Amino acid sequence: MRRARGKFKGGNSALRVNVPKENAISDYVTASGTFQDGDIMLNKEGIRVVSQTQTSTPAANGNISLSDLETVKVLGKGSGGVVQLVRHKWTNETYALKVIHMNIEETTRKQIVQELKINHASQCPYVVICYHAFYNNGLISIVLEYMDGGSLADIMKELEPKCIKEPNLGVVCKQVLLGLMYLHQTRHIIHRDIKPSNLLVNHKGEVKISDFGVSAVLANSMAVRDTFVGTCTYMSPERVLGGTYGFDSDIWSLGLTLLECALGKYPYQPPGSEEGWMNFYELLQTIVDQPPPVAPADQFSPEFCSFISACLQKDPKCRPTAAELLNHPFVNKYDEEEYGLAKLLPPLVPLA
């Protein structure tokens, strides 16, 4: 296979990583026990953003304190912490509580703070809500909206065949595009990690964007980035090459995500092998060198095939914006009431 053009090179010998100086967690904690990183302050009473350019930041939910929350079960673990399903003792409302031990490597800590800042300031029905956050005894606790339907990746695992039908994806697509349009146009944020496991669903069938740990906030909507973060398998070719990129990189990731959900498998498959990619670098070279995957015309509508092709343009300048894609025929092809994801979810089981 040909070596990818540009900055990307396969093989461990080509990798060079500059490791920045690590700061201890104590460098971020004041004498009063408040965690401060840049313009964000956290303590056991809650969160405060001390120099906010936006005036639209929602006030933290004053009805929530950590002592009012009781753990129901553990939902998952990762990034140096745990996510729990918790219930408010007095209102019986449920939340997802992300608890992170901040004595972790600085890069991960910065990502967590970045996620918190973005979530706390976001006001969009297509972005997971952050209700409150606290810092106490080395732990940051983030109170998030509980998406009880899991992720698109979770839903696919429970279906047979393990894929989401095109009409359902049409409804999903519209909601994700509305979320991306808000992030790109209003917040000037590149998500940088759109994938099935980061698109969450609730029992109403509402789809919301989550996990902003690697997102980039740009000074304006015309700016670009050149850092290499996110899930590599969903990266656009220009990101794999280490070049500059903008909001259009999220559009590539969306196209790849929708195609994976439709096919029931990751769209880039190794030629002549059913066992998956044996070499990670070969996959990245394929993303850079080979034509992008397409939706099979004998399995999907012309509108869906056209939408996927529009997203998976290797030249980022040729990809439409989220706002432009909202006018694509595929997005409004299917009725939201008839094809919402709520019908694919199992019945809700009452909490004990």
UniProtKB/Swiss-Prot annotation:
Q: Which GO terms describe its biological process?
A: defense response; response to chitin
Residue span, Protein kinase domain: 69-331
List, alphabetically, the SUPFAM superfamilies matched. Answer: Protein kinase-like (PK-like) (SSF56112)
Q: Kindly list the organism's lineage.
A: Eukaryota, Viridiplantae, Streptophyta, Embryophyta, Bryophyta
Chain sites annotated for binding ATP: 75-83, 98
Protein name, per record: Mitogen-activated protein kinase kinase 1a
Mutant lacking the gene: phenotype: Slighty reduced chitin-induced cell wall modification compared to wild-type. Modest reduction in chitin-induced MPK phosphorylation. The levels of mRNAs of the defense-related PAL4 and CHS are being less induced following chitin treatment.
Q: Which family does it belong to?
A: Belongs to the protein kinase superfamily. STE Ser/Thr protein kinase family. MAP kinase kinase subfamily.
Which Gene3D superfamilies would you find in this protein's record?
Answer: Phosphorylase Kinase, domain 1, Transferase(Phosphotransferase) domain 1
The recorded induction information for this protein reads: Slightly induced in response to chitosan.
